[in-house]
């Protein structure tokens, strides 16, 4: 003022100095886009806004609530941190549930080896992912050591590749790897049944056949692995649940007698095994029920739809459920839905594959539920899956 400059020039100079200071010291050498969002309390100063327009020559957009965008940003960051913590708690809860299922599965399993006893190896594959609690008790009560193969890991996958001769589906290829890992542990027997039918109480289907590989897997493994040459006996009873409990008792009694066990002891051991399986199934069912009850009606949930062993085996599901949970999504599986208690024989009378019945039942439940979204997991080379995916 003393030198004769007007107030307008001085204010304009201050406005330009603020703009130049920001561009030189804050923006620096970084590129400036074609559209600029101008926000914060400084936006009230029209002189600074005009100086920015003059200096940059670009479009400047002013949001409606420009003076409180900082507060809005702080609120968004707070909300993000809150839900991040909440998601972590939910992930821990889900992990805890997985651990509880694993504890139920292995409740009566020790893996201890008594050198005075012979050892039976059970591969952790296919339907044995569900039936193991029964056969673990059965063989333990008959006086055997029981060894369960590990969860599918890199070593087992490599062994599967080494011993796979025919072009089969991935779950069947993994059987070779699991059996090979048991052979390395020098077991005396490999227990791997044939599964012909799997009847469920509510099903009114004309037939309930397992796939051809489940029916023939013991023969495939015996040939590929050369069990007889290695001095390992294969125990492969033919399981057919369609024929009822009496048939199952008769089949497993025959196997027990081939092991030179007392028939009364065999029956007693089998009953204890069946009880253990029922307890396992009820325990898993309760965990699933508790999880679903915690979900709100409008909460969006992913449902993993696949076969039982596809849900349990991380090598088959590629840990997709875990990845989704880490992303903050709620995830449940087909076993958490009442799919096993639905009869779809009127709609699909020729769906002879039991797993297919469950998958279609689950898909029907998801279709009729606004908050459920299905993720269908299949494995390379599965024939029935190739057909079901078109439904």
Region locations from a protein language model:
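Hydrophobic/aromatic-enriched cytosolic interaction surfaces used to assemble or bind macromolecules
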Residues: 26, 47, 55-56, 69-86
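Adenine-nucleotide phosphate-binding core of ATP-dependent small-molecule kinases
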Residues: 1-23
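Short, well-ordered coil loops that connect the C-terminus of an alpha-helix to the N-terminus
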Residues: 32, 57-58, 227-230
């Amino acid at each position: 003022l003393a030198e004769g400059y007007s107030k307008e020039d001085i204010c304009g100079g201050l406005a330009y100095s603020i703009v130049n200071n920001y561009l030189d010291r804050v923006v620096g050498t970084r590129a400036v886009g074609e559209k600029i969002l101008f926000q914060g309390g400084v936006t009230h100063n029209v002189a600074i806004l005009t100086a920015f327009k003059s200096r940059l020559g670009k479009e400047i957009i002013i949001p409606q609530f420009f003076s409180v965008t900082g507060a809005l940003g702080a609120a968004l960051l707070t909300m993000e941190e809150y839900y991040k913590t909440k998601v972590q708690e939910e992930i821990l809860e889900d992990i805890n549930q997985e651990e509880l299922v694993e504890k139920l599965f292995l409740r009566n399993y020790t893996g201890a080896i008594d050198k005075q006893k012979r050892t039976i190896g059970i591969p952790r594959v296919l339907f044995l992912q569900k039936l193991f609690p029964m056969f673990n008790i059965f063989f333990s009560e008959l006086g055997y050591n029981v060894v369960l193969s590990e969860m599918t890991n890199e070593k087992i996958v490599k062994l599967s590749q080494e011993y796979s001769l025919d072009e089969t589906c991935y779950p069947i290829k993994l059987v070779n790897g699991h059996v090979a890992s048991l052979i390395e542990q020098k077991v005396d027997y490999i227990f791997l049944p044939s599964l012909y039918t799997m009847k469920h109480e509510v099903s009114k289907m004309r037939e309930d056949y397992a796939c051809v590989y489940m029916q023939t897997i013991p023969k495939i493994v015996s040939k590929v692995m050369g069990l007889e040459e290695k001095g390992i006996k294969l125990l492969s009873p033919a399981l057919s649940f369609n024929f009822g409990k009496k048939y199952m008792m008769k089949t497993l009694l025959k196997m027990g007698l081939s092991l030179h066990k007392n028939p009364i002891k065999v029956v007693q051991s089998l009953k204890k095994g069946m009880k253990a399986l029922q307890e396992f199934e009820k325990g898993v069912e309760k965990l699933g029920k508790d999880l679903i009850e915690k979900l709100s009606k409008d909460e969006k949930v992913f449902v993993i739809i696949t076969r039982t062993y596809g849900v349990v085996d991380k090598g088959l599901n590629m840990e997709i459920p875990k990845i989704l949970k880490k992303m903050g999504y709620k995830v449940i599986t087909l076993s958490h839905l009442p799919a096993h208690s639905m009869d779809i024989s009127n709609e699909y009378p020729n769906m002879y594959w039991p797993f297919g019945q469950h998958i279609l039942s689950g898909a029907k439940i998801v279709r009729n539920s606004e908050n459920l979204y299905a993720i269908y997991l299949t494995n390379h080379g599965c024939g029935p899956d190739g057909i079901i995916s078109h439904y």
